[in-house]
Amino acid sequence: MIPTGLLIVDDEPALLGLLRRYLERLGYDVETCTGSTEALARFQAEPDRFAMTITDLSLPGMSGEELIGKMRELRPQLRAIITSGYYYEPLAEAVGFLQKPFLPQALAEAIEKARS
């Protein structure tokens, strides 16, 4: 089975709720987590569910970049987008970067770009 889920990680619950509602209306299977430890546990429980993770760079516990690395130990082909309020030069771990604040439509476009 081809994974289709999106795992979105950010320590701002209001932003997570907004993105979840928007992306679900577009037909995505969305799971949200407010921390890296919770996200890693969720991913480890269902690694074949998620096609992509979208994570904030600055998270309590471990950075978004570290989180992506740990997830890719289980699924090397996992696609990823990092978000941050600070400029960030994406490394090999990420296929995309979105500077905060961003519009939900910009995230949808970044997801489509990362999927292709």
Residue ranges of predicted features:
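Active-site residues of response regulator receiver
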Residues: 56
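Short hydrophobic/Thr-rich beta-strand motif most characteristic of the beta2 strand and flanking loop
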Residues: 27-35, 42, 79
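Acidic catalytic/metal-coordinating carboxylates
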Residues: 35-38, 63-66
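Charged docking surfaces used in two-component/phosphorelay signaling
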Residues: 17-25
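Conserved phosphotransfer cores of two-component systems
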Residues: 44-48, 70-78, 86-90
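C-terminal output helix
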Residues: 102-115
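The feature encodes the CheY-like receiver
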Residues: 16, 60
